[in-house]
From Swiss-Prot:
Record field: transmembrane: 21-41
Role noted for this protein: May help in the organization of the PsaL subunit.
Gene that specifies this protein: psaI
Protein name: Photosystem I reaction center subunit VIII
Localization, UniProt: Plastid, Chloroplast thylakoid membrane
Keyword Transmembrane among UniProt keywords: yes
Length: 52
């Protein structure tokens, strides 16, 4: 009986520990990393010599 209850308890503990720090991970990701990737990709696209 201990083994079937282990996985739900482990998942609930993981989620309860992860949820408070999730904004600390997502805010820099969305605010800094995604715009940086977008700027690099748009720069590479603009600098292509091909005309479609």
């Amino acid at each position: 009986m201990i083994i079937p209850n282990l996985l739900p308890n482990l998942l609930s503990n993981l989620l309860s520990n992860l949820l408070p720090i999730l904004p600390s991970i997502l805010v820099p990701l969305v605010g800094l990393l995604l715009p940086a990737i977008t700027m690099v990709l748009s720069h590479l696209y603009i600098q292509k010599d091909e005309i479609l």
